[in-house]
Swiss-Prot record:
Gene3D superfamilies per UniProt: Cytidine Deaminase, domain 2 (3.40.140.10)
A Pfam cross-reference name: MitMem_reg
Protein name (database record): Eukaryotic translation initiation factor 3 subunit F
Organism of derivation: Mycosarcoma maydis (Corn smut fungus)
SMART domains documented for this protein: JAB_MPN
CDD domains xrefs: MPN_eIF3f
Molecular function GO labels: metallopeptidase activity; translation initiation factor activity; translation initiation factor binding
InterPro entries linked to this entry: eIF3f, EIF3F/CSN6-like_C, JAMM/MPN+_dom, MPN
């Protein structure tokens, strides 16, 4: 930590080389990517909180590179904040048991930090951050905050922010640290993007049938193809300057589609794929029915 010269009153903080737990870090985190699944899990935990509980916390799971962290999943962790005594209690045994269980399902996802459903950063946050810094050692722990207060007075609710901590003071203590904000963005796959678009739409309607959903998807594809054709024609005619990145992406996309096939061959391949899908659906229904019959027979015996 260093103070600026006389021409400025700003306080300059170097990204941490260590944390309050005494763990050395080789390189600071420069960005955080969050998947929607993790955010929905945090919201679900908040909605199921105990009466009178100000905020809930939990463990973040994901992957990391040298400079970035990708948050893919999370799980809740019971905790208690005692304002009178100025103490916070975290159920560490529950945290470690849940992590061992998650490792059996997804061994590639490790602890990357923790979340809280409150934008407030206080002494309790510093103490919890110190605990998770030990769990993620020798890497830095990320603290993700979610603002769940949607009262209409703010331009946008559910503000997502992420931080890393830096020790403060000549003698570092667990409760003395400063939180440094990190760039945070939403990372989603194509199926997740479709689901988010459906949730964000304001239209209230009955669930679509499979054929209706297919028709909507085909219309969206047709609309996207029209946009691509308009762009390509504008580039060819010289009305718009071409982008090499867009051109490479279009080339990779087109190369995936089988070319040089006549209509009969393409129809044969499509029908074969359709038969495979129907067979998988039929087998899934058979397994589901067998499981239900087995469970009912178990109850009778």
């Amino acid at each position: 930590m260093s103070l600026a010269g006389s021409s400025s009153s700003a306080l300059h903080l170097d990204f941490p080389a260590s944390t309050g737990s005494g763990v050395m870090h080789s390189r600071s985190v420069t960005g955080v990517h969050v998947h929607p699944v993790a955010l929905f899990s945090i919201l679900d935990h908040y909605l199921r909180r105990n009466d009178g509980q100000h905020r809930v916390i939990g463990t973040l799971l994901g992957t990391r590179t040298e400079s970035e962290i990708e948050i893919k999943n999370c799980f809740a962790v019971p905790h208690l904040e005692d304002a009178e005594e100025g103490q916070v209690q975290v159920d560490m045994e529950y945290h470690r048991s849940m992590y061992e269980l998650c490792q059996k399902v997804r061994p590639d996802e490790v602890i990357v930090g923790w979340y809280a459903t409150s934008p407030e950063l206080n002494t309790y946050s510093a103490l919890i951050q110190d605990f998770y810094s030990r769990e993620t050692a020798p890497h830095q722990a990320v603290h993700l905050t979610m603002d769940t207060t949607i009262d209409g007075s703010k331009p946008s609710g559910l503000g997502i922010k992420s931080y890393i901590s830096s020790p403060l003071g000549a003698t570092p203590k667990a409760e003395n640290c400063v939180f440094l904000p990190l760039p945070t963005n939403l990372l989603h796959s194509t199926p997740e993007h479709s689901s988010l678009s459906l949730l964000a739409s304001q239209n209230i309607s009955s669930p679509l049938t499979d054929l209706d959903a297919l028709a909507v998807s085909l219309k969206q594809v047709q609309s996207q193809l029209d946009r691509v054709l308009t762009y390509v024609r504008a580039v060819i005619s010289g009305e718009k300057e071409g982008d090499k990145a867009v051109g490479r992406f279009l080339n990779d996309t087109i190369s995936v589609v089988p070319a040089g096939l006549d209509d009969n061959k393409l129809e044969t391949l499509f029908n074969a794929h359709l038969q495979d899908v129907l067979m998988v659906s039929y087998l899934a229904n058979v397994v589901r029915a067998q499981a239900e019959v087995s469970s009912r027979l178990t109850l009778l015996t």
